[in-house]
Structure formats: C-alpha cells, structure tokens
Amino acid sequence: EICACLVGSEMCIRDRLMAAPLKNRIVLGVDPGYRTGCKLAVVDETGKVLDTGVAHITVSKGASLEREKDVIRKMLRKHHVTAVAIGNGTASRESEAVVAELLKELPYSAAYMVVSEAGASVYSASKLAAEEFPEYDVSLRSAVSIARRLQDPLAELVKIDPQAIGVGQYQHDMPKAELSAALDGVVEDCVNHVGVDLNTASFSLLSHIAGINQTIAKNIVTYRTENGAFTDRKQLKKVAKLGPKAFEQCAGFLRVSGAKNPLDNTAVHPESYGAAEQILQECGFRLADIAGQDRS
C-alpha cells in the first residue's frame, strides 16, 4: 500500500512540475479573496514584477464595483497583458467571471487560466520569498507566484516543499521521511530532464541540478551578477567551489542561449562535443545549422 501511495504521489507531483510553460507572455497573476480583496501582480516575459495592486471585485457592487474593475482594466492596458493566471482558491469563480468580462473589452486578444494555488501561501511566507521580494507584502508575493506558475511551472514550484504542492489524498498516510525522499527525487529528475538556462535560472532551480549544491548555486548567481551573463559553459569553471567533478556532473543540464558554440544550448555534454560535430559533419550539416533552434 505504501509503495502504491508513493507511486501515486510521484506521478502527481511530476505532472504538476512538467506542465507546459507559457513563454513570451506578460501575465497578470490574481490571488482571489473576499474581505481582503484580490491581490494582483503583473510580471513580464522573464518573470520580473512590473506592477502590483489590490481590487475588491468579489464583494463590491454598482459604482463601487466599477471602480474596482478599473484597477484591473488599467493594469491590463498599461502593460498590454495577454494572459491572466487566476488562483483556484477562495473566491476563484467570482474573480474568474469578472476577469473574463474585462478581457472581452480589450482591443487585442488575451486569455485567462485558473491555476493551482497549492503551496503559494507557504512560499509567500518563506525566507526565500522574503529574500526575493523584500519590498512586497506576503499577500502580493502569492499573486506573483501564481503569475509565474503559468509562465514556467517548474521554475516556480521548485521553490516550494513538494509536500505543500499537493500530491494526492493519501500523502499523510505515508512515512514522512520516505515521502520526502521520493518527492525530492522526482523534483530533481524533472529539473535535470528539462535542463535550465544558466543565465536566467534562480538559485532554487540551480540547486536541483546534479552536482550543484546550495553553496555552488549561490556562487553561480553571484558570479552572474558580478560578471554579467555567461557566454559559454567553460565559464562555469571560474565559479567558486565548482570543481572538475561538479562541472562534469552539471554541465550537460545547463544551457547557455546565444553562446558562440550552439552545442552549449543543448543537452550534449562538453565531453561529447567532438562526437556531436563529427555526426553533424557526416550527415552533411554544420554547427551553424543548429544555431537559433530551441533545444531546451
């Protein structure tokens, strides 16, 4: 029974982590609520926060409701929002109805999607969220998290304890240690299966890459901040505490978009570049032929 529950939980968490991302969209995140209102956050294509606010659209009526709707209207038009992520918790249906109505008013095409709020409150009150968004209230951090979940579920959900994401009704019937180990393994498998962009990946995402612990992940972010974007995988060797063995383990999972060598943006490990180039040559292709293609 325990094995069956573990397998079910692993499948559930894997499905959530591997949900398709929504790329190149400016997204409005809505964390629904009644008394405290709906918390709002607009993020750009990279997840950077552009705007925040609160709108009491679920309890207001008449002229008051129109004023609250205007808060969202202005955000949508000011930032040319093309996608809205609505949390599925309290007041979700009422918020959904208002958002759907407002999107129809826009002079351009836009859509909304209801996303799982599971773990958003846990993340927003965490030390990690406080370090990432010290200038924002806890409730607004939840709205940011909801918006980013639509953009890139994997990158956002790795910041949260897997058990807080919601992994099935039997998760509390299993030994906590076994469940935690199994779910952590699934998270690591998913991150390494997809790979991450070395120049945009957060500390949380990097720390799940094979060969990279939390110290090295912080050092990568620090190096990136101090020296600018990585231009190739070889630069990883300059990161503090990232030795030859760690490089051997992690290099194949880290992508460098726009690198001079297109293979740096693929799952091909540096030690196999020679073989990859030979295969391309024998098939009548050059490295330049794969440049610019999405290999993530």
What are these regions (language model features)?
Residues 1-8:
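Single conserved hydrophobic/aromatic residue that forms the stacking wall/gate
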Residues 2, 84, 220:
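Hydrophobic positions on the alpha-helical face of helix-turn-helix-like DNA-binding modules
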Residues 9, 14-17, 23-30, 35-184:
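Phosphate- and other anionic-substrate recognition elements at nucleic-acid/protein interfaces
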Residues 51, 193-296:
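Accessory alpha-helical DNA-binding modules that contact the DNA backbone or grooves
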Residues 56-57, 131-132, 186-189, 217-219, ...:
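A short, structure-level motif marking secondary-structure boundaries and short turns
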Residues 152-223:
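Charge-patterned, long linear interaction tracts outside catalytic cores
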